[in-house]
Regions:
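C-terminal beta-signal and adjacent terminal beta-strands/loops
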Residues: 46, 93-109, 144-191
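Hydrophobic, well-ordered secondary-structure elements that form the walls
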Residues: 20-22, 79, 90, 139-143, ...
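Gram-negative outer-membrane beta-barrel transporters
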Residues: 1-104
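Solvent-exposed loop segments that connect transmembrane elements
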Residues: 1-3, 50-64, 100-129, 166-183
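Outer-membrane beta-barrel proteins
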Residues: 8-12, 66, 130-133, 182-184
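Residues that define the transmembrane beta-barrel architecture of outer-membrane proteins
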Residues: 14-18, 71-75, 135-139, 148, ...
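A generic structural signal for ordered secondary structure
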Residues: 42-44, 83-86, 139-141, 150-155
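Short, glycine/charged-rich beta-strand-loop motifs at protein surfaces that mediate ligand recognition
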Residues: 126-132, 139-141
């Protein structure tokens, strides 16, 4: 018997968006000359999709924009102030809101049927497997002093100690109800 499986082809994977990059540099005078640099890098996700043709010819189209890992907006910005041997740095990271794949949203139910997040009544919206997150922003700051042969620096990453969003790990990639692998800070504030 002849086996003819052919080559598995994803057909078309598409990523389309707009990148925005802005850098501003100047020296400002506040009694002493201070070098100022402001930079912003942002990305707007317009399309992230996959078109797949099964061996029987059935075409399956999946759109990912706005879902986990493919938020509509991502951005990073920084402000640097430098004077003499001192340097101050403030960075911000932003991830836009995300939602679960519409096809994977479970019907409302209790923990004894399809939901594994609580024991409420079947119509309780808090019992649905949860896989949505609002926008997320963290700030980090540092200050440093540099001499010819030594350097001293200190900083705080995730200044506000912002946790990643809660989500059901049976719906998205996560551990202990925390989304992992999507750009969220998992370490919390550290110095």
């Amino acid at each position: 018997q002849l086996m003819d499986l052919g080559f598995l082809n994803r057909d078309l994977e598409r990523a389309r968006g707009i990148d925005y990059n802005l850098t501003f540099r100047d020296t400002i005078d506040i009694g002493v000359p201070v070098d100022l640099q402001i930079s912003i890098a942002a990305n707007r996700n317009l399309e992230r999709s996959l078109t797949f043709t099964n061996p029987d010819g059935t075409v399956d189209y999946e759109s990912y924009e706005g879902e986990w890992g493919f938020s509509e907006w991502r951005a990073q910005s920084g402000v640097v102030l430098a004077w003499d041997k001192w340097r101050f740095n403030w960075q911000t990271r932003y991830l836009g809101a995300v939602t679960q794949d519409e096809d994977a949203i479970d019907a409302f139910s209790d923990a004894f049927t399809a939901s594994d997040t609580c024991l409420g009544p079947p119509t309780d919206e808090l019992c649905r497997d949860y896989a949505e997150a609002g926008s997320y922003m963290i700030h980090s700051v540092s200050i440093s002093y540099e001499e010819d042969n030594w350097y001293l620096g200190m900083g705080v990453r995730n200044l506000e100690d912002k946790s990643p969003p809660l989500a059901d790990p049976s719906e998205i990639t996560g551990v202990k109800s925390r989304a992992i692998g999507y750009g969220y800070d998992l370490m919390g504030r550290n110095f």
